[in-house]
């Protein structure tokens, strides 16, 4: 018996209410069974020749669960999950998307993912409203930023601080 996606809602910039609970933040390609992944991709990724705008975020309802999802700003990579600004975990992205799954859903479809600390971040979240803007998600105390790279920002802050770096004016130049 194949389980199907019951509904798919394009939220755009509309906010989504999330109940308190334990959630997994990861790329949905790691969680959805193969037979559902292609159906989901047809709904999320638009072909330019169809003349439709692709949704940037939305909610999928399946098996009595609501799964919020959003596109990353720059595609694949590794992204931090922050609580009150402090990094509490990270997750990998291979499909340019990230989602907030109820842990029960992940336990049913991909329980091994809960052990993958670089592909998924599991955390308890209070009730809140998920907001999305250009690849960034905020839900009260929990935030994911994909529109800038934390490591790049740290590197930029440190640029020029190396005492051995004389700005390219070495005797060898």
Regions found by a protein language model. Give the residues of each.
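Intrinsically disordered, low-complexity acidic regions enriched in Pro/Ser/Thr
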Residues: 1-173
């Amino acid at each position: 018996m194949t389980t199907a996606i019951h509904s798919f809602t394009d939220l755009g910039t509309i906010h989504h209410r999330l109940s308190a609970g334990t959630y997994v933040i990861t790329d949905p390609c790691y969680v959805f069974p193969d037979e559902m992944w292609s159906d989901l991709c047809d709904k999320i990724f638009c072909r330019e020749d169809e003349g439709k705008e692709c949704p940037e975020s939305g909610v999928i309802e399946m098996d009595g669960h609501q799964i919020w999802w959003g596109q990353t700003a720059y595609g694949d990579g590794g992204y931090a999950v922050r609580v009150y600004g402090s990094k509490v975990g990270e997750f990998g992205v291979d499909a340019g998307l990230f989602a907030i799954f109820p842990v029960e859903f992940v336990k049913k479809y991909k329980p091994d993912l809960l052990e993958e600390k670089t592909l998924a971040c599991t955390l308890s979240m209070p009730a809140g409203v998920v907001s999305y803007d250009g690849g960034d998600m905020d839900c009260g105390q929990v935030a994911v930023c994909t529109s800038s790279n934390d490591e790049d920002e740290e590197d930029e802050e440190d640029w020029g601080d190396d005492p051995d770096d004389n700005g390219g004016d070495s005797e060898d130049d």
